[in-house]
């Protein structure tokens, strides 16, 4: 997961 799961500054949208 990415931004929609972690904090919002990991991979992007929801990767």
Curated annotation (Swiss-Prot):
Keywords on record = Amidation, Neuropeptide, Secreted
Known InterPro entries for this protein? Pyrokinin_CS (IPR001484)
What compartments host this protein? Secreted
Q: Does the keyword DNA-binding apply?
A: no
Q: Which GO terms describe its biological process?
A: neuropeptide signaling pathway
For whether the record's keyword set contains Secreted, the answer is yes
GO MF term (any one) = neuropeptide hormone activity
**Which cellular component appears as one GO term in the record?**
extracellular region
Q: Which residues carry this modification: Leucine amide?
A: 15
Membership in a protein family: Belongs to the pyrokinin family.
- What's this protein's function? Myoactive.
Q: What is this protein called?
A: CAPA-Pyrokinin
């Amino acid at each position: 997961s990415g931004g929609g799961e972690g904090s919002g500054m990991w991979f992007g949208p929801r990767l």
